[in-house]
Every structure is written in structure tokens, then in C-alpha cells.
From Swiss-Prot:
It comes from Nocardia farcinica (strain IFM 10152). This is Acetylglutamate kinase. The gene is argB. It comes from the Bacteria. The keyword Transmembrane helix does not apply. Disulfide bonds: none annotated. InterPro entries: AceGlu_kinase-like_sf, AcgluKinase_fam, ArgB, Asp/Glu/Uridylate_kinase, Glu/AcGlu_kinase, NAGK-C. Pfam families: AA_kinase.
Length: 303
């Protein structure tokens, strides 16, 4: 028996009543959710995430999903006999790897998520950064051991044209965005889903960015588990970034970009927890780590 089934009818009513302030706070607001990690591998977590997105839409929140596909891309590369390599937390993307990335993100991962959400109603529509000029990318390098390092067809989002996403939101749909994007010359690049989610959240005026991870939140001194922090401001995070584990850097860079770009708060949450997004949005306790633009000077901490 699951915990929800063990609740009495009165308990369930209290849960709904307690959520009312948060339902009011986020009604008609855009929440960008970066979907990745274990939440997109485990079948139960996939279904729970899809149900969460349908729930948000049903109660008047406007979710926008930006997804990665790292495990699926790695599996397909292995199946095709192609070598996969990471540098500085980013996948090295040759033209051959880019073909696989494009195929897997939009043709496999995105389609599956759209189908799971649409099991709850005709809500989700899949698009990519190539569609309607949503994203324009610029090729990036990463710093590895203090040296700038080429990682191939990997880009940063430098321009966002939000019209297509806003049109879908206005039509009551849930945009599901695959993170591939052309540069100014039309050359398609692999965009890290964390950084793409941050750029999109900034570009469409989101109320919140939520990034799913495979850890409880941000550890300021990993692997010391007592260093898990529930909140951090942009200045402190910027100082901490050079000392973070490589896998967390893109996620925390994304949160930093979002809040510096006008998004009120960004959160990294544990995607291994079923319904983690609902826990973050609709409970006073929240979950994971919240990033704010600056230290609250008035004692008020954003939700």
C-alpha cells in the first residue's frame, strides 16, 4: 500500500487545503522544468513526472518541459559502435554524434514524454530549438584543468525567440522542448539541457526554473553529506562554482543564469523522488536547493 492510499479522506482534504496558497501563487505563471537524470529512465518516475505536468496544467500553471537525453544518447552511440566522451561535464559532439543526438532527442525521448503526458489529455506538443527559430546557438568551449577545450558541435543559447512556446501556452498546451539548435549559419549544435532550460526560462519570463537531478540538492562540500544546503544566493553560488563536481556545474550554472536573467527563483531537486515537482511547488517545505538572485535583505525568502 502506498502512502497516499493509507491517508484518510480527511487527510487528503487537508493536503489539498494546505496547497491552496501555492496553487494561487503559481496560477497563470510559467514554470520551466528541466527533465533529466533518473526521472527519465525509471518507468514509474517517468509516469509520475508526466502526471505532474498534466496536474500543473489542470490547476492553471503553465509548465514548459526542457529535456535532455544523455543516457539514451549514450545507449544509441554504443549500439552504433560510436565512441562517447565527456569533457568538463559536456558531451564531445562530432558531426556523427550530432546526427545521433538529433535523432534520439527529438525522435525518441521527446516523443515518449509527449505520449506519457498525453495519456492524461491532449496537452503536450513536442518542438525543438530548431522550430520557428526558438533557439540560436553559439559554439562553446569548456575549461578543463585550467585550459579552454574544444568539445565539438556543442553550443550555448545566445538568442531565444519565445513566440512558438508562448503560442502553445496560450493554446493550453504543454511545450516539450528538445535541446538542439542551429547557429547563425544553420549548423545544428547539441545544447546542454540545463543551459537551454535557463535561457528559455529567462526568455519567456518564467516564474521559476526547476532542474531535476540525481542528488538531493547542492552540496557545498561534496562528498560531505552534511553540506547539503537548502538555499544559496547568486553571489555565493558564483564563488562556489569552480569547486563543484563537474556533473553539477552545468546545472548550477543554469540556475545562476536564470536568476541573474530575471527569473525569481531556480531550484535543483531530487528527480528520484516521485512527484518531486509537486513537492517543490505546492508544499511549504519544498525540496532540494533554491537559488535566489541575491541574499534577501528584508528577511523574506521567495517560495
Amino acid at each position: 500500500m502506498t502512502a497516499i492510499h493509507s491517508l484518510t479522506a480527511l487527510d487528503k482534504a487537508h493536503v489539498l487545503a494546505d496547497a491552496l496558497p501555492w496553487l494561487q501563487k503559481f496560477r497563470d505563471k510559467i514554470v520551466v522544468v528541466k527533465y533529466g537524470g533518473n526521472a527519465m529512465i525509471d518507468e514509474e518516475l517517468k509516469r509520475a513526472f508526466a502526471a505532474d505536468m498534466a496536474f500543473l496544467r489542470t490547476v492553471g500553471v503553465h509548465p514548459v518541459v526542457v529535456h535532455g537525453g544523455g543516457p539514451q544518447i549514450s545507449a544509441m552511440l554504443k549500439k552504433l559502435g560510436l565512441h562517447g566522451e565527456f569533457r568538463g561535464g559536456f558531451r564531445v559532439t562530432t558531426p556523427e554524434v550530432m546526427d545521433v543526438v538529433r535523432m534520439v532527442l527529438f525522435g525518441q525521448v521527446g516523443r515518449e514524454l509527449v505520449g506519457l503526458i498525453n495519456a492524461h489529455g491532449p496537452y503536450a506538443v513536442g518542438i525543438s530549438g530548431e522550430d520557428a527559430g526558438l533557439f540560436t546557438a553559439t559554439r562553446r568551449t569548456v575549461v578543463v584543468d585550467g585550459e579552454p577545450t574544444d568539445i565539438g558541435l556543442v553550443g550555448d543559447v545566445t538568442e531565444v525567440n519565445p513566440d512558438a512556446v508562448l503560442d502553445l501556452i496560450g493554446a493550453g498546451r504543454i511545450p516539450v522542448v528538445s535541446t538542439i539548435a542551429p547557429d547563425a549559419d544553420g549548423v545544428v549544435h547539441n545544447i546542454n539541457a540545463d543551459t537551454a532550460a535557463a535561457a528559455l526560462a529567462e526568455g519567456i519570463g518564467a516564474e521559476k526554473l526547476v532542474v531535476l537531478t540525481d542528488v538531493e540538492g547542492l552540496y557545498t562540500n561534496w562528498p560531505d553529506r552534511s553540506s547539503l544546503t537548502s538555499s544559496i544566493d547568486a553571489g555565493a553560488l558564483a564563488e562556489l562554482l569552480p569547486r563543484l563536481d563537474a556533473g553539477m556545474v552545468p546545472k548550477m550554472e543554469a540556475c545562476l543564469r536564470a536568476v541573474r536573467g530575471g527569473v525569481p527563483t531556480a531550484h535543483v531537486i531530487d528527480g528520484r523522488v516521485p512527484h518531486a515537482v509537486l513537492l517543490e511547488l505546492f508544499t511549504g517545505e519544498g525540496i532540494g536547493t533554491m537559488v535566489t538572485p541575491s541574499a534577501a535583505s528584508d528577511g523574506v525568502v521567495p517560495a
